[in-house]
Amino acid sequence: GKGTKTMEFRDKPMENLIRLQEKDICKNARALLLDGESIVGAYKTVRDQVIFTTHRIIMVDMQGVTGTRQQIFVLPYRKVLHFGIQTAGFGDPVQASQLTVCFADAHEAKFGFIGQQELFAVANAISRCIL
């Protein structure tokens, strides 16, 4: 059913995330921001987007040939049980690092970043909400 598709997208690792310019952030995701909520970092894969705010993760699944159809998932930090980070090793070709976020419903979301600076900015935002 529809729930399965949602879980598949949420559970699929988002790899090689590249920082998005502010102007390129999905308008529908931006419309979800609340007063006092700000964007910590916005990233994209080849097609999809993930926006980390001061309160939650907003994942945008771009669908269709043009990507105009979108499915948006909101993962609030208050539902996070714990998270883990894996930094790149010396000599790793891509310098990839990964953030794994585990939620109260036993699902986890994985995000792969190029470099480590982005990873720590996002991890700090999550820490502020769950500690």
Task: Describe each PLM feature range.
Residues 43-65:
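Conserved beta-hairpin
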Residues 31, 37, 57, 98-101:
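Short amphipathic alpha-helical segments, especially helix-boundary/capping motifs
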Residues 3-50, 114-116, 120, 131:
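Anionic N-terminal interaction surfaces
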Residues 9-20, 65-131:
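Acidic, Ser/Thr- and proline-rich intrinsically disordered linker/docking segments
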